[in-house]
Amino acid sequence: MQGASRESLAAAWREAEELLVRPRPGAQPPEEVGTQLFSVTAILDEHPALRRALSDPAVEPGRKVSLADRLFGERIGETARRLVATVVRARWSRVRDLSDALETLGVLALLVAAERSRAVDDVEDELFRFGRIVASRPELRDALANRTLPVENKVRLVERLLADRAHPVTVALVTQLVRHPRGRTPEEGFADFSGIAARFRQRLVARVTTAVALTDDERSRLRRALSELYGRDVHLHVEVDPRIGGGVVVQLGDEVIDGSIASILAETRQRLAS
């Protein structure tokens, strides 16, 4: 993606992480969100006129969101609906970029599901390895790329190959590529999804402890400050612990930035005692 589309996708990615990684009580499971976003992507791919209408920069964003909600609102859950609205409201350089963004967020949602079971590393590795297997076996590659072969036959083939050998999220992602190649070769599809997985894993996760809950604005400012400090996108996992008295403690890997009142008092007492 280029220009406005790249910026819009980055903003939608951040919104998706906020909704999926830090869900509110009763929120949709991420695997359900991913499946529903894939369904919306498929519908937009099948109806180019609808895709053009939802990506038209001349149409007021609120009208496009209303149209999307009328079309998909009863088919998808609250989190998926909010992400569709985010994508529809954004500005895209190409019409196809809108549906590409929805697919990307669908992949992201499934990766979040894998992360919850501490399996996201396995999923990335399995995607890469299965992609290499497909590329190295012409008969398998041709079977998956064959447009005359019924889709369900290809899905069953994938399920047989991956059964009991891969994480369910890996199976879901490969199945998505087989059902909806979206004009890509198998190699291109695996490269796209592996790239999304790599991007997700490369982010830094900061474990933040505060005495009181942070506001959304405080979260945003802290995330931006840490991202600028480390030169990479930083996601926050925030915990509230009144015992620190005030201030904030940030841990990224082995590095700890301790700005808590409890730490300052302990340091002061130590200096006075020396």
From Swiss-Prot:
The record's function comment reads:
F(1)F(0) ATP synthase produces ATP from ADP in the presence of a proton or sodium gradient. F-type ATPases consist of two structural domains, F(1) containing the extramembraneous catalytic core and F(0) containing the membrane proton channel, linked together by a central stalk and a peripheral stalk. During catalysis, ATP synthesis in the catalytic domain of F(1) is coupled via a rotary mechanism of the central stalk subunits to proton translocation. This protein is part of the stalk that links CF(0) to CF(1). It either transmits conformational changes from CF(0) to CF(1) or is implicated in proton conduction.
Is Cell membrane there in the keyword field? yes
Q: Which organism is it from?
A: Acidothermus cellulolyticus (strain ATCC 43068 / DSM 8971 / 11B)
Q: Where in the cell is it found?
A: Cell membrane
Question: Encoded by which gene?
Answer: atpH
- What PANTHER family would the database entry show? ATP SYNTHASE DELTA CHAIN
Chief subcellular location? membrane
* InterPro entries the record matches: ATP_synth_OSCP/delta_N_sf, ATPase_OSCP/d_CS, ATPase_OSCP/dsu
UniProt KW keywords: ATP synthesis, Cell membrane, CF(1), Hydrogen ion transport, Ion transport, Membrane, Transport
Name this polypeptide is given: ATP synthase subunit delta
- Gene Ontology molecular function terms on file: proton-transporting ATP synthase activity, rotational mechanism
The top of its lineage is: Bacteria, Bacillati, Actinomycetota, Actinomycetes, Acidothermales
